[in-house]
């Protein structure tokens, strides 16, 4: 069944999806897939929610913009779950933490929801969902292999 916001069908997305907020960033990421943007398949553009599927080193991968904030991100992720996506990797910018430099990589072990949508989804109780350790290890290894200063640990998410 097509999803109401993404207008996508099962099979449109790879099991692994990169999630930038900015639609322009989604297009820039898809342009780095094997064969560039021309080889990527545009799978969603409804409501400005740009999504592409392609490959990276022969491995299927998708990128899907979430726009800004936890409410829209939760809608996009729920629809992607309905379409069979199993791994979500948030990429892009973030609010500031002391001691971090511009261009540093942050690999989140868990995300504590402090207010707003995270509180609603957690039933008003504090939650700290944790990331899959194999994914964390792969992200840390790739980040360091690319020479990035890499920070690993819990993060806080808030949309208020």
Residue ranges and their predicted role:
Residues 129-160:
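Active-site rim beta-loop-alpha module in soluble metabolic enzymes
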Residues 1-138:
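Metabolite-binding pocket within alpha/beta catalytic cores that recognizes anionic/polar moieties
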